[in-house]
Amino acid sequence: MKKTLFVACCACAALAFCGRAAANVTFGITEDTGALGDPTMFYSTLNDLGATENRIAINWDPAQPTTIPNQPGLDYWLPQATIHAVRVLFAVAPAHPGDITSSPSRINQFAAFLQQLARTYPFVKDYVIGNEPNQPRFWQPQFSSTGANLSGSAYEPLLAASYDALKGVDPSINVIGVGLSPRGNDNPFAKDNVSTSPVRFLHDVGVAYRASKRTKPLMDELGFHPYPNQNNDPPLKGYPWPKAGIPNLDRIKQAVWDAFNGTAQPVFAERGKTAPANALKLDLDETGWQVAIPAVLQNLYTGKENVVTIDEGTQAQYYSDIVRFVSCDPDVRSLSFFHLVDEQPLDRWQSGLLRLDDSKRPSFTSVKNAIAQTQGKCALTPPGWSHTATVNGATVAFGYLGSPKGWNNKLWRFRTTVQEDASYKAGVFKLGSRKLTAKAKKAVLKALANPKSKPLLGAKGTALAYKSKLVALPKKTLKRSGWYVYGIRLAAAMNPQRAFVSVSRPFLVKSRPRARK
């Protein structure tokens, strides 16, 4: 039943849009050197799987700024990647969360290290810059002591310097930005895991980029890690805004558009428009679901499990489904599973296609079959994406307005809901007649859009995602009887140029009774 539902959702998504041609999605494994103990066996296993990419993490330590970690291992392994036609990606990140922000010289040192890597391994053409900098485990500080976000604005100059450094060595190098975590609580005063959501992190990178007046891009692709929120969540469950998962990739694309549209940084191609040659692509370079260890193999693992695991059959289904799902997204260039082989400590990752004894899980066969069947292509017309110019999920309920309101009425209110944070400006507007003419509506909309205009009984505020907001106007009487309307303009917090406006039906305010003589 789960498989039928997932495939049906993929088909419906494909049929719902006018698609565009896209290059095939490629598949890979996020695994450092040492898996299976031998590079020939490792890359032969990737060939058997149908995986053509291997993302390798390289941690830069400012205490040894020119030392390439595990260089003998890389020198031993990487030639086999070339022999087996496996594309290697280096994911280069600071070894400690405060390495970049603790000294003004660190960005230049990091950029110089990237150039050293590029000259040492000229056949490696893909670099991921950083690893989940929206998470405190990998980047600190996330916020200032007053609660202002710092991580996005501090990461932007690192990405810019990295782009320039790598392109200076070889313009054909593919620079992959960010490597975003799908999560983030946006709470600078949280008890733990003080982190930044992916949508807000991209927004802050964009603000810093625009402020820098940079005339060159920051990245060629965007790295994103669409892990589930809870390990036992199915792939299509996703996240609420401003987080994102497998089914929320359009949310990431919109965040990029909000952050960079109109700048030198390319955004994602859009449905119905000719895709520019340099349109941004998604590199989904980490995802995985952890599984329960069979009793006969538990002696190979150490420690205690720290997540709710799924069974191996469910993992196999999820992985196969994901291959098919991303194959129908023309903006995805690649997907990599984390890992090929389990990690030994149970509080780490047992998400591999192989168990710790190197035996194959059912997911190995399911992924192999899915790659072979799809070839990274969509069975139907691939869906496309286009940016929205409005506020996602915005609705307004003005309530019943069919009865006249008394001259002494002081209660003016209605409700609005949104699926992303938004600011609002609202008020009451006088009409010249009982009808809301096109001219009158235009005047209301113009007043709402003008920051200097002051509607009758005006109010401003913030509507939070997924929470019904009571828009309460000042408790005053209207001086004149006649016909009125409510009006509200919502502006997206991530891009105030995206707006939603709504005007109520006209309602009558009765005149004050004449005093008896």
Language model segments and positions:
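Boundary/entry segment of secreted carbohydrate-active catalytic domains
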Residues: 22-59
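Short, acidic/polar
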Residues: 33-48, 106-117, 197-211, 313-325
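Noncatalytic carbohydrate-binding groove/subsite architecture in carbohydrate-active enzymes
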Residues: 40, 106-111, 150-309
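Aromatic-rich peripheral "rim/lid" segments of glycoside hydrolase catalytic domains that contact
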Residues: 41, 45, 65, 133, ...
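Substrate-binding cleft and catalytic face of glycoside hydrolase catalytic domains
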Residues: 46-192, 229, 289-292, 343
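Aromatic/hydrophobic beta-strand junction motif of beta-rich domains
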Residues: 398, 412-420
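Short, solvent-exposed loop/turn segments at the edges of extracellular beta-sandwich modules
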Residues: 491-498
